[in-house]
């Protein structure tokens, strides 16, 4: 089965409500969908999301990388050389992790169809996945109301966005904790919004108030690894690296240096399933648990993350709610409350 063409389609999808973090406010996404065509009529699908504030990738650049160097190294190649093709994509250009992720996902889809197995089976596992759901940063009473609504819909784990205004963050979390049942799990994401001393002060106060926070993502700037370690070493609540980790190389440095307690893996940061698996493996050797998440992106890419999460034994936490924010999504994932339903392939419903 040989690859005959690589095509791209760009589409915009509105969100039900604005998605607000310490870094940005999102009202719509632009999905860059990738289609790898073969001489046997099989078409593999993948997708990328432009998130320049995190990855540095813009939609035009993603499209150009896919239709330029990545397409060139795939045309005429046989899918039986699957592992080599994945490597060629990573070596085709510097950076561009989102474009690489989209093509990586599409290659996996072609290969799964060639082997007639779903992605989770190809990767070697299928555990049940329940996602958290995000509460955007806002006024405390608005966040508390939103949190209560999510719990009423069956979500037991809430991911709370903080970091936009430190003096309000304690009030936000306390309002949410008081509005939901005690057994509701709360995890926080500061999206780089605090400095190291500010983070320690806020987290210690949360601990003193017994707010029972499961873990806190990226409290400080992505490049402030020393600050990340400082926070980790001065609080009891586990600290998760997110924007600080893009690659398996980053993962190795973080676990060797003890910079974080946990790692958050995203395909748009690391460049695809292959590199994500390597990150989870490296973390596992150091006894560091991983979460998988996504940017604000479409079902085509998030469903690939779900299959990865179902298969890898060191992925323990799941943040896969992005498609639930979209007003319309013609194909991809389905949910039963917080449960993520895995499809028979990356791009089709079961």
Task: Describe every region a protein language model picked out.
Residues 48-56, 130, 134-138, 294:
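Glycine-rich phosphate/pyrophosphate-binding beta-alpha loops
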Residues 4-15, 29-31, 295-350:
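Flexible C-terminal active-site loop/helix
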Residues 113-136:
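N-terminal small/glycine-rich loop or linker at the start of catalytic domains
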Residues 1-45, 49-53, 326-327:
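Structured beta-strand/loop patches that form or line metal/cofactor-binding pockets in enzymes
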Residues 128-142, 190-191, 195-196, 240:
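Active-site mouth loops of central-metabolism enzymes
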Residues 5-7, 37-114:
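Metal- or metallocofactor-binding catalytic centers and their adjacent structured scaffolds
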Residues 160, 167-301, 327-338:
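Catalytic core of soluble alpha/beta enzymes
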Residues 3, 34, 41, 70, ...:
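Conserved, mostly hydrophobic/aromatic
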């Amino acid at each position: 089965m040989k690859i005959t063409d690589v095509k791209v389609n760009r589409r915009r999808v509105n969100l039900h409500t604005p998605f607000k973090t310490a870094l940005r406010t999102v009202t719509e996404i632009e999905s860059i969908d990738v289609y790898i065509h073969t001489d046997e009529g099989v078409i593999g699908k993948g997708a990328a999301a432009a998130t320049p504030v995190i990855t540095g990738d813009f939609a035009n650049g993603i499209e150009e990388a896919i239709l330029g160097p990545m397409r060139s190294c795939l045309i005429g190649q046989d899918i039986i050389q699957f592992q080599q093709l994945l490597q060629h994509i990573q070596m085709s250009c510097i950076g561009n992790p989102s474009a690489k992720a989209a093509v990586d996902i599409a290659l996996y889809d072609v290969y799964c169809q060639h082997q007639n197995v779903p992605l989770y089976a190809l990767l070697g596992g299928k555990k049940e996945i329940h996602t958290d759901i995000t509460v955007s940063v806002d006024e405390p009473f608005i966040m508390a109301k939103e949190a209560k609504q999510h719990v009423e819909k069956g979500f037991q784990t809430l991911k709370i966005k903080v970091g936009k205004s430190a003096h309000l963050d304690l009030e936000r979390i306390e309002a949410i904790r008081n509005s939901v049942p005690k057994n509701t799990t709360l995890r926080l994401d500061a999206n780089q919004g605090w400095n190291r001393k500010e983070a320690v002060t806020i987290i210690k106060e949360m601990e003193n108030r017994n707010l029972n926070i499961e873990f806190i993502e990226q409290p400080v700037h992505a490049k402030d690894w020393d600050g990340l370690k400082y926070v980790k070493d001065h609080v009891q609540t586990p600290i998760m690296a997110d924007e600080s980790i893009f690659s398996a190389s980053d993962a190795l440095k973080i676990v060797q240096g003890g910079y974080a307690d946990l790692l958050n893996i995203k395909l748009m940061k690391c460049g695809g399933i292959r590199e994500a698996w390597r990150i989870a493996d490296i973390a596992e050797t150091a006894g560091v648990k991983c979460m998988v998440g996504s940017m604000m992106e479409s079902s085509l890419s998030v469903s690939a993350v779900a299959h990865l999460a179902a298969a890898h034994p060191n992925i323990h936490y799941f943040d896969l709610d992005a498609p639930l924010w979209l007003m319309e999504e013609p194909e991809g994932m389905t949910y039963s409350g917080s449960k993520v339903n895995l499809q028979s392939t990356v791009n089709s419903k079961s």
